[in-house]
Amino acid sequence: MVPGDFVLKMKQGDSVVFSASTKEQSPASIRRKFNAYAAEAPHITGLEDQLKHCADSLISNHNGRKMICAGLSWLKTGLLRETLFSIAGLTLYAGRPEDFEEILDNLIANEEDRLFTKTTQVEAPLLMTVALQDYISSGADPKKVWNKYSTTLKKILESYLPGGREEISMQPDGLLWAQKYRTALTWMNAYVNGVPV
């Protein structure tokens, strides 16, 4: 055998349980786990079901708090920019409006520093307005949304006034200027030889 290969001759009617693990388990317990998972798995009949299932897989539960998983294993869960970009699609348009506020509230609680003070994702806090507009467009009561999130929105906008953030501020003409020595400040955050592209 070659490392990484598993070969088994089977005939019609055979049933095999294969598990690769660092701990030994009985085949019966593995089969029970598989059958329990298979029973809970959604019934997928087409592309729309598959998209909804994939969207559901990106919403995770961390210590009882729902968050959006950004990039599966290679990025953290609950990242500011990634959550604000994807929250409407993964909740509102996927038929899960009840998750929108819970995920957004968790994001606000976890990302206060980056929302109101400093971040290398200088445009990300402003995406909060887009997310809330999407929420209202999907049927949320504008007055309730304003009552709940107006303080957050005002703090975000005020943080862009001169002196509010080290890396970005509003200029006299109303435009935003972002600059910090040797630091990438937008979604284009690639570096070459230690210098942002």
PLM features: residue spans?
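A short secondary-structure junction motif
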Residues: 58-62, 107-114, 163, 167
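Alpha-helical support elements that line or immediately flank enzyme active sites
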Residues: 74-110
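Acidic/polar, glycine-enriched structural segments that form the non-catalytic walls/loops
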Residues: 1-76, 142-150, 154-162
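The feature captures the catalytic groove of carbohydrate-active enzymes
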Residues: 1-4, 9-17, 114-151, 158-197
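Generic structural signal for well-ordered, non-membrane alpha-helices
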Residues: 18-19, 105, 109, 130
